[in-house]
């Protein structure tokens, strides 16, 4: 079960990265890890650093993917972003937090991809 969830997560991140590249964003980091956790994607959108949380699902019976980001998760992502900015010497950079929700069909094809800019 955990392996299937990891695979779904990787598929979602790949779909999100392709989508963002088509929009003209530059991927700076995928799965950036530190002791506090992991950032799914870090991209540049012009002069803005964007921290992207990707949520992938195969159905909506448990709610929408973007609804699964709790207040605690948002706080953790802000901390991770601050750590990233400190590591890269970019603490003065403009940044935002986006969410990309990817819904896959049973064959693993993207059924719907939604991008929420400035999600929190």
Curated annotation (Swiss-Prot):
Origin: domain of life: Bacteria
GO molecular function: nucleic acid binding
Short name of one Pfam family: UPF0102
Gene3D superfamilies given in the database record: 3.40.1350.10
Protein family membership: Belongs to the UPF0102 family.
NCBIfam families xref list: PRK12497.1-3 (NF009150), PRK12497.3-3 (NF009154), YraN family protein (TIGR00252)
Protein's recorded name: UPF0102 protein PTH_1707
């Amino acid at each position: 079960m955990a392996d299937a969830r990891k695979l779904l997560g990787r598929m979602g991140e790949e779909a999100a990265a392709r989508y963002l590249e088509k929009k003209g964003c530059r991927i700076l980091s995928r799965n950036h890890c530190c002791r506090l956790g992991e950032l799914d994607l870090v991209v540049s959108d012009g002069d803005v650093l964007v921290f992207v949380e990707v949520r992938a699902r195969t159905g909506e019976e448990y709610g929408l993917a973007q609804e699964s980001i709790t207040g605690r998760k948002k706080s953790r992502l802000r901390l991770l972003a601050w750590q990233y900015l400190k590591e890269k010497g970019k603490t003065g950079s403009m940044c935002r937090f986006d969410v990309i929700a990817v819904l896959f069909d049973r064959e693993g094809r993207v059924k719907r991809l939604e991008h929420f800019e400035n999600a929190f």
